[in-house]
């Protein structure tokens, strides 16, 4: 928390999807002046979070960090983020990219999921997609952004040819 405080005050704490929420309350407790927002539907999974607002479409941080709700994948209800100043697209579980240098269980699982050595949607997320057209509509705006870097929550950061890799990752849905 000291490293974050050195950057500046924490004004918002976000649970970006229905899977990434375990440290939401500890962060809120450590940042008493911050506002907390949760993914749509997370309050059903975590009744202790019912007092928090859902991530708004018009967010107070929108001038710095633009959010895009991803429809069609209700198991996640993920919002992804674009930081225009750096051209960075930030994703949690919508896409994965595990390094081919990983070994053991990580290499095995990422290979089975189809995300070993490439940016892509895991086979489990493809299977969990409930509305492919809605998902396609949701990701279409992402492919028009001036993305210079893709940060995924699991393993690799994509600095080389991020737009081409995004297009390839979402080709199955178009």
Briefly describe each language-model feature range.
Residues 14-18, 38-40, 70, 84, ...:
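Short His-Asn-centered micro-motif
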Residues 23-27, 37, 52, 68-69, ...:
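Phenylalanine-focused residue identity feature
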Residues 1-2, 34, 95, 174:
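Metal-centered catalytic cores of metalloenzymes
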Residues 2-61:
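Active-site HxH/HxHxD metal-binding segment of metal-dependent hydrolases
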Residues 37-173:
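Metallo-beta-lactamase
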Residues 1, 21, 132-136:
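Short, well-ordered alpha-helical scaffold segments within catalytic/effector domains
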Residues 19, 31-33, 57, 63, ...:
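Generic serine detector
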